[in-house]
Structures are given as C-alpha cells and as structure tokens.
C-alpha cells in the first residue's frame, strides 16, 4: 500500500512538472494547490455554517430552547483557524521533503520528456504542414464557389451547399487519415515513455531512497499526531460550551413540560 501511495505521489509531482515543461509556465507546488483549495473550502463552510446556526437560533425550536449558538460560533471559527495554522507547517515540511527526495526522479523524467519531444517533433511538424496544405487546398476549391454565390444570388445557394458537402467530407476524411498516421507514428514513443516511467518507479522502489521515505513518512505521521493533539483539544474545549448550552436548554424544556403535565 505504501508503494502505491508513493507511486501516486511521484506521479502527481512529476506529472505537474511535465505539464509545465511543455507549457513553460512556473509550476505551482502540490502543497500550494492543496492550501488554495482548503482555504476556499473552509471559508465557504464557515460562512454557510454561520448562516445555518443563525437560522437555527431564530427558529421556533431555537427560541423555545433558548439556544445561544452564535455566541460560541465565532470562538469555534477561531479555533478551526488556529487548528489549520498549527498543522500547516507540518504538512508544508512533508511536501518539501517529498519534493527534495524525488528531485532526482523528476530530473530523469524531464530528460526523458526532452528526448521524446525531440524525436516526435518532426512528426508533429509534418502533421502541421499536412493540415496546412489540406486547408489551403480546401480554400482554393471553396473560393470560386463563394464568388459564384455572390454573383448568382439565392437560387444558387442550394447548388453551393451541394458542392460544399463533398468538399467538407473530403477534408474531414483526409484529416482523419493524417491523425491516424500521426497516432501510429507516435505510438512507439508513448509506449517507450510508459516503459521508462515504470522502470523509474521500480528503481525508486528498490532503492534506499524508498526505505528512507518510509521512515520519514512514519516520522511525519508521528509528528503530525503530536502537533494535532493540542489543536484538537482546543477544538474540543471550544465545542463544550455549545454542547453544554444545548444540553441545559433541552433539560430545562423537559422539566417545564413535566411540570405542566403534573399540574394538569
């Protein structure tokens, strides 16, 4: 299972680098993407959660039970923010170490990508050239038909459509042929890249780096657990006033209902 987790993590990291290698953009680290998503998600939950709490407190049941949930909601939000802040550096350190430990693998994969790119570039250039020629050929055949339409008005529109249909179908069929040819030409290189990636992952699995990573991952989980304990305890303490208030309100309502039944 650990090997699967590591493989996915490596693919995630190298995949990100490979995508930016082709696009030539500045890569965003995996932790940055996680932080961006988590921040937006948590902020949305905080806002929507406060709305739900306000609705519950102002409802008939909330008024009857004399709930004071909003008094504690801001405290809970602060507690969640503190929890996120406390655990953030630990996770950041983990991603930094993982990126550093797999830097050699990313470099090897980038070399492989560069080599494959150089090999397939002639096929891509030829494909682009063929498609340009097909489009020029199509324009040369369609151009006179446009002139004919302008000169012949509406009655020739149907004739123009009949003439354009086979031309469009011919262009489509020839384009498909070029795409199929390109796919056939690139297939060996795709298989080669897949085989290279498999070899890199097998080498990683058999290397001492993998054993070191397992030890570091265990250490990280232990540190994460130790860091999380006080933060989770703060969260529990923040929840206690809400639970106690709700418990007291419910017991009070039950007591009042019992007295009313006894009086009857």
From Swiss-Prot:
GO terms for biological process: adrenal gland development; amyloid-beta formation; blood vessel endothelial cell migration; cellular response to lipoprotein particle stimulus; cholesterol biosynthetic process; cholesterol efflux; cholesterol homeostasis; cholesterol import. Sequence repeats lie at residues 67-88, 89-110, 111-121, 122-143, 144-165, 166-187, 188-207, 208-229, 230-240, 241-264. Belongs to the apolipoprotein A1/A4/E family. GO terms for cellular component: chylomicron; endocytic vesicle; extracellular vesicle; low-density lipoprotein particle; spherical high-density lipoprotein particle; very-low-density lipoprotein particle. Keywords: Cholesterol metabolism, Glycoprotein, HDL, Lipid metabolism, Lipid transport, Lipoprotein, Oxidation, Palmitate, Phosphoprotein, Repeat, Secreted, Signal, Steroid metabolism, Sterol metabolism, Transport. Glycosylated. Palmitoylated. It comes from the Eukaryota. Residues 1-18 form the signal peptide. This is Apolipoprotein A-I. InterPro entries: ApoA_E, Apolipoprotein_A1/A4/E. It is found in: Secreted. It comes from Chinchilla lanigera. GO terms for molecular function: amyloid-beta binding; apolipoprotein A-I receptor binding; chemorepellent activity; cholesterol binding; cholesterol transfer activity; enzyme binding; heat shock protein binding; high-density lipoprotein particle binding. Participates in the reverse transport of cholesterol from tissues to the liver for excretion by promoting cholesterol efflux from tissues and by acting as a cofactor for the lecithin cholesterol acyltransferase (LCAT). As part of the SPAP complex, activates spermatozoa motility. The modification Methionine sulfoxide is found at residue 109. The keyword rRNA processing does not apply. The keyword Signal applies. Homodimer. Interacts with APOA1BP and CLU. Component of a sperm activating protein complex (SPAP), consisting of APOA1, an immunoglobulin heavy chain, an immunoglobulin light chain and albumin. Interacts with NDRG1. Interacts with SCGB3A2. Interacts with NAXE and YJEFN3. Residues 67-264 are annotated as: 10 X approximate tandem repeats. It holds the Pfam family Apolipoprotein.
């Amino acid at each position: 299972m650990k090997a699967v987790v590591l493989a996915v993590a490596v693919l995630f990291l190298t995949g990100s680098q490979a995508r930016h290698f082709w696009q030539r953009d500045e890569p965003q680290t995996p932790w940055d993407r996680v932080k961006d998503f988590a921040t937006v998600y948590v902020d949305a939950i905080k806002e929507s959660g406060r709305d739900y709490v306000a609705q519950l407190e102002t409802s008939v049941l909330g008024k009857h039970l004399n709930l004071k949930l909003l008094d504690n909601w801001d405290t809970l939000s602060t507690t969640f923010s503190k929890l996120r802040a406390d655990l953030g550096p630990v996770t950041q350190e983990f991603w930094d170490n993982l990126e550093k430990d797999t830097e050699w693998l990313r470099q090897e994969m980038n070399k492989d990508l560069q080599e494959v790119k150089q090999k397939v570039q002639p096929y891509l250039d030829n494909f682009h050239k063929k498609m340009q020629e097909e489009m020029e050929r199509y324009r040369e055949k369609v151009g006179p038909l446009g002139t004919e339409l302008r000169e012949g008005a509406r009655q020739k529109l149907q004739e123009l459509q009949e003439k354009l249909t086979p031309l469009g179908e011919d262009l489509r069929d020839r384009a498909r042929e070029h795409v199929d040819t390109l796919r056939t030409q690139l297939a060996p290189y795709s298989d080669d890249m897949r085989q290279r990636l498999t070899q890199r992952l097998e080498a990683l699995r058999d290397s001492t780096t993998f054993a070191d990573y397992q030890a570091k991952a265990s250490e990280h989980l232990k540190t994460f657990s130790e860091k999380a304990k006080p933060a989770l305890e703060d969260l529990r303490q923040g929840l206690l006033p809400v639970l106690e208030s709700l418990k007291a309100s419910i017991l009070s309502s039950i007591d009042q209902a019992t007295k009313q039944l006894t009086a009857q």
